Amino acid sequence: SLDTSNLIAEEVAQDKPAEVENLEEIPTTDELMQNPDVREQPVADSDDSDLTVVSSGAYWTIYRNTANGEYSMRMFGNVPSSRPTAWNSYLKSIKHIEIEEATLTGSFASYFRNNVFTVLESVRIERSNLSGVTSFEMAFYSPTLQKVIIRDNDYPTAPSLRTTEYMFGYTHKLTELDVSGLDASAVTNMNCMFNYCSVLEELDVSNFDTSSVTTMRDMFGSSGKLEKLDVSNFDTSSVTTMQAMFYGCTSLEELDVSNFDTNSVTNMSYMFYNCAGLEELDVSNFDTSSVTNMYGTFVGCNSLEELDVSNFDTSSVTTMQAMFNACRALEKLDVSNFDTSSVTTMQAMFENCTGLGELDVSNFDTSSVTTMAYMFDGCTSLEELDLSNFDTSSVTTMAYMFQNCTALKSLYLDNFTTPKTMTGMFTGTTALTYLFASHNLRAFDGLANTRWYDEKNWVQFSNYKELQMYHEYQREPTGYRKGIFLSLTMDAMGGQFEEMEEQKVQNKVSGEYWEEMLPVKEGHYFDGWYLDQNFTNKFDFSLPATVSATIYAKWVENYTVIIPASISLNEASELKVEGINRGSKTLSVGLNYEETTISESNKLTLSNTADTTVQCLAPLSWDGSETNPKNAILTLAPGSEITEG
């Protein structure tokens, strides 16, 4: 069912019109039977032997069916729009009216209404001249009518019919309607013409000439059983309002309005309200340049999977309230070109668009908007909303604006200001992990009461109140992330980093990777990061961050053995340096040289018999002692490169 509880009421012209005339108390059928003055006489001009004439006049005859006791009336000849007083005794009894081979003249407004013919069930107008009829306004406005046939009629002169407003309004029991014999070419007003034809399943208006019509407000409104409706040939070039035109046509599965000329239309509010059965609707050619009101235009079209409004000119629109409310099946909606500079209300605009996975409103001009309450309420598939360009300086209420956006992960509110009302603004945003908010937005009502942190300054908050208090003191837009951030403290253990710090602290979110930083220490070389100061558990930077930790730099002291020598090598010779470690320290062996003594064509490479990949200052270790020395030999081969160490 359609939830419209958050919509502000707007008149859709559903109220019943006032009575048009006062009638004297009319006797019932039982009273007629006991009134000797109106006893029926056998009918002479009928083929039905059960019918007897009870009263007649110049253009009418009233019958009673002796088999079932029902009263009926037949009209013919020149039929005026007035009702003779002779009918008064039968108005509460006549169930069927037939008008054949007649000429009708004047206004037949409210002619067959239920406050006149209180039990009327059927009306048939056939083979008659209707050129002189000026009005059928509310003519068949009756909850008792079940069948109306208007067909095979003549228009020897130009039709005079100007209004069919409420012509079949509130015909709750009407199951059969034929208007093929109605010439509507001169009609200007079709407001509510078929309003509340609640059980009517078929209606053929495919041949209607609507070229003169200026208003179609609520024309088919609340005709919830209509399964087919062909309006593809409607000429709507003169129409100024289509408000609620198809309001509540819940059973329509197809509706072709692709040829509608909407150049003059100013009001499209509720136009397709609750057309819940429509799976397709082509409005891509609509000219909406004159439209000012799009209140609830597509509200409740919950079967529409696609809706192309990308070419809508919305420069004149002042209200978009509930425009797409409850379009539950829509997965995409392109409103990126909407000109919203004149819009004052966007309340519930996308409420309950549960299928929308993405929505680009980044270009919306919201400088004139005063209400954004419920704007995205119930958009359960949206994961990100960029409202960074929204100007909310005129907004007074954002109540429940993002309520139950349960999939929303990121929200950008760069330019938001604090409105008068923001009750429940973030209620139900359970998946929200990132919020970038203006420093002028002072509260986050309904935000998850859990841990958050300032992503820039790495300040941790244990609950929502701490976050809000912190944000009140910010002087620039700030980004907040849900959860706990992790810290890695890197202790240089006597060494230093580039900026002379002895410690470095980096912060990451769980799952991210730590950055390895290398300190330096004079007289030592760096031998890695460890999780303990005994250097038994080496830290692995290839693993994602899962916990906060402190790591320690391991240093190895350098010892230098100086061997003064002048070295001259040819291609066949080599230099060997032997050393004996008589202690427990690691021995590094290097070669210092004067740049001018090394030929560019005969460079040397320092190699190690134990590890040929080690160059220069290659660490050599001995486990021996004076009684059990172990020699390590450093070999300089021809063609090797020596680097200073």
In which residue ranges do the predicted regions lie?
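Secondary-structure capping and domain/repeat boundary segments
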Residues: I484-Y559
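Serine/threonine-rich, repeat-prone extracellular segments and beta-strand-based repeat modules
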Residues: Y464-Y480, L531-Y552, E626, I633-A637
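Solvent-exposed, conformationally flexible loop/turn segments
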Residues: M500-W514, T546-S548, P564-A572, T609-T613, ...
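Asparagine-centered strand-capping/turn motif at beta-strand->loop junctions
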Residues: G579-G583, N608
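Structural beta-strand segments of beta-rich domains
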Residues: Y71, E571-L575
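N-terminal capping/linker segments that flank leucine-rich repeat
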Residues: L2-G132, Q146-L161, V179-D183, L413-T417, ...
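Short acidic, flexible loop segments centered on an aromatic residue
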Residues: V589-I598, A618
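Structural signature of tandem-repeat unit edges
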Residues: E70-N78, K92-L104, F117-T134, P143-R162, ...
